[in-house]
Amino acid sequence: MAMIGDVNRLFKKHSGGRDLSDVPARAFTGFMALAQAINAAGSTDPKAIQKALQNIDIGPETLIVPYKGIKFGKDGQNTKTRGILMQVQNGKYCTVYPFELAACKLKYPMPAIK
């Protein structure tokens, strides 16, 4: 996840100062997996790209999300993903799980909105 700082700086520059949250981080990760598959396919032919995606196996060291990697099962789902939970704390998104990557301590129960 070493690239996340660089990606966040670029995102912040083009998003009005907002930090990267889960949706754009997952979109970036999916786009990078697709780019890798296109390179592996050596073609823009959809069937070649599909085959490359079926065989893709990306390790966690090149991702900006805390997945264990990217590898698609027979159902087309990533078998190496895991949940990432965020809370809004002090007006900003903050990762609270997985605990080993948490940027903020989980607040539970969440305080009432005033």
Question: Predicted regions span which residues?
Answer:
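Extracytosolic ligand-binding ectodomains
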Residues: M1-K114
